[in-house]
Amino acid sequence: MKVAVLGAAGGIGQALALLLKTQLPSGSELSLYDIAPVTPGVAVDLSHIPTAVKVCGFGGEDASPALVGADIVLISAGVARKPGMDRSDLFNVNAGIIRNLIGQVARTSPNACIGIITNPVNTMVPIAAEVLKKAGVYNPNKLFGVTTLDIIRSNTFVGELKHLDPATLDIPVIGGHSGVTILPLLSQIPGVSLSEREVAELTKRIQNAGTEVVEAKAGGGSATLAMGQAAARFALSLVRAMQGDENVVECGYVESDGEYARFFAQPLLLGKAGLVQRLSIGTLSAFEQDALESMLEVLRKDIALGEDFINK
């Protein structure tokens, strides 16, 4: 199994690469790419960690040496949020980066499963889909927006509030991956009941958790460590599924059946070829139903922005 990380010299990329070096199955290959010249050095640094995972690193404009033979490509390249920016402010810079990198993936490793971490995910995934489509290699079962950070934050915040071990929780989060489009299904936690006020406050905190980190870092960056952990969790689940484990389920942002929007985050059954089945979002509470209906216009606009970036 070969996993490539594009954007590997950044805060998320380095955290993700460290976790993959220590947790990928023995015999795996980890391939790191970043435009920054430090990237081969990051690979050398990681290579000293005693696990049976081979690491190589590539810098410069051309990502293709890192992509040859990749089974999974994780993309965290781009600029990070600073105070006062929201994820959509990142669009102007990051859209061009994703267009370029996905073009290289389409040429070099067209059959790889792709996980988009770069924000705004709501818009970057449609950009990736349109680039792959133009290249004639788009497979909707192999393109994922990584929304796992919303799930782990939900687990953490509910665990804190209810004095539970967050590792025992797995709260589904649907919709998208910014602001109001993030909808944690807090009515679906077995054995945990929350008041209306708790639900409203938790939902808001989960939706705004990224801003909480940006402000706490006081201009020094955005969420890199928790995002690295979230991306590693998603990637390792995908690796397990691709190697034949059954019943591997993670939430992710994928091309959907179109009931709510062209792309939608929901629980996914993963398998050897990527996405096997979009699972039901279950029965929503009245609060969740209202939140879902009121976010869809925002989500659809985010998606259209990405489509238009490539097609206009």
Swiss-Prot record:
PROSITE patterns: MDH. Its EC number is 1.1.1.37. Keywords: NAD, Oxidoreductase, Tricarboxylic acid cycle. Substrate binds at R81, R87, N119, R153. GO terms for biological process: malate metabolic process; tricarboxylic acid cycle. InterPro entries: L-lactate/malate_DH, Lactate/malate_DH_C, Lactate/malate_DH_N, Lactate_DH/Glyco_Ohase_4_C, Malate_DH_AS, Malate_DH_type1, Malate_DH_type1_bac, NAD(P)-bd_dom_sf. SUPFAM superfamilies: LDH C-terminal domain-like, NAD(P)-binding Rossmann-fold domains. NAD(+) binds at G7, A8, A9, G10, G11, I12, G13, D34, N94, I117, T118, N119, M227. Gene3D superfamilies: Lactate dehydrogenase/glycoside hydrolase, family 4, C-terminal (3.90.110.10), NAD(P)-binding Rossmann-like Domain (3.40.50.720). GO terms for molecular function: L-malate dehydrogenase (NAD+) activity. GO terms for cellular component: cytoplasm. The active site is at H177. It catalyses: (S)-malate + NAD(+) = oxaloacetate + NADH + H(+). Pfam families: Ldh_1_C, Ldh_1_N. The keyword NAD applies. The keyword Oxidoreductase applies. It is an enzyme of class 1 (oxidoreductase). Belongs to the LDH/MDH superfamily. MDH type 1 family. Catalyzes the reversible oxidation of malate to oxaloacetate. HAMAP family: Malate_dehydrog_1. Homodimer. NCBIfam families: MDH_euk_gproteo. This is Malate dehydrogenase. It comes from Edwardsiella ictaluri (strain 93-146). The gene is mdh.
